[in-house]
Amino acid sequence: MKRPAIVSALICLLLLTACSEPDKPSIALYLAVQRGDLDQLERHLHWGTDINAILPYGQYPLQTAAQNGRIIMVRNLVKHGAEIDRTTTAGDTALDLAILAGRTQVADVLLAAGATLDASALLLKAAANGVTDRDTVRFLIDHGADLEHRNDNGDTPLLVAIRQDNHRLATQLVGQGADVNVRAADGDSALGLATRLNAPELVSLLKRQGARPTSD
């Protein structure tokens, strides 16, 4: 091959490479993740932005993407080395945030990538957060959540739901087999607690399911 031909070939190759290289990102990574801007995320990934650096509001990019249900973003971040089990300043992992937000499809992606799940502890946290999403509850139970697991105060998820007068969650938990005769740390029954807290809907629910008062 003659020299001019070689030079021309090299120039063409350089031009093709330049054309295939994405522009540098024009917005911060945290904005790209918040907005679900895949183009900007790809730019950050190409130009070497640290995807395991904490964002201004205490989360990491993977956690924000997971919480917002950005499946493609989550896959891309994991593929490029995002630390799956890193926790926020509040102690939540990307998987925790996805499940608590009802993003069960994202949760499946994270589990497949090796994320760690403590389903029993997270069900208690979901109850404490006032979660009512049926998919969230079902997902945690399907992944081994113990309905009778207790928090530091001695409450099961059902007792937490009763304390919050969360009828929807209590209904779901009872429907999944939660013990309606469970007792709190002070010996009060679920029915006794609901009665004392003046929660008539919960009292009715528990009685229909055969709950007994404390004195029994």
Annotate the PLM regions:
Residues 23-31, 54-60, 87-93, 117-127, ...:
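Ankyrin-repeat boundary/"N-cap" motif
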Residues 36, 69, 102, 131-132, ...:
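Ankyrin-repeat intra-repeat helix-capping/turn positions
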Residues 1-8:
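Bacterial N-terminal signal peptides that target proteins for export
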Residues 16-18:
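C-terminal motif of bacterial Sec signal peptides marking the signal peptidase cleavage site
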Residues 42-50, 75-83, 108-116, 138-146, ...:
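Ankyrin repeat domain, specifically the short helix-to-loop turn at the C-terminus of the second helix
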Residues 27, 31-80:
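Post-signal-peptide N-terminal segment of Sec-exported extracytoplasmic proteins
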Residues 40, 72-73, 105-106, 135-136, ...:
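Conserved ankyrin/ankyrin-like repeat signature
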